[in-house]
UniProtKB/Swiss-Prot annotation:
InterPro entries: IreB. The lineage of its organism: Bacteria, Bacillati, Bacillota, Bacilli, Lactobacillales. Disulfide bonds: none annotated. Belongs to the UPF0297 family. Pfam families: IreB. NCBIfam families: PRK05473.1. This is UPF0297 protein STER_1937.
Length: 88
């Protein structure tokens, strides 16, 4: 599949946004409980897609794999922008 010069729309429904946020929080806690640096591990997963960055502990690996990585990135960007005063 090739690239286009046309702008493409990407939409994520509101229900998924809340679920992704909750999942990231749960995964973060599971990683911290196991002694990992949660931010580094989540970034490793998002960039590579390799689920080995997230442990099976507390079902964290299965939870995060329910979502496409682009959906996770969208939620992270939205959260960051809202936290910095951007009106979305």
């Amino acid at each position: 599949m090739g690239f286009t010069d046309e702008t493409v729309r990407f939409n994520l429904n509101d229900g998924d946004k809340n679920e992704i946020s909750n999942t990231l929080t749960n995964v973060y806690r599971s990683l911290a409980e196991k002694g990992y640096n949660p931010i580094n591990q989540i970034v490793g997963y998002v960039l590579s897609g390799d689920p080995a960055y997230v442990p099976r502990y507390n079902d964290a690996r299965n939870q995060i794999r329910k979502y496409e990585r682009d959906e996770i990135v969208e939620e992270l960007v939205r959260y960051y922008l809202k936290g910095n005063g951007t009106d979305l």
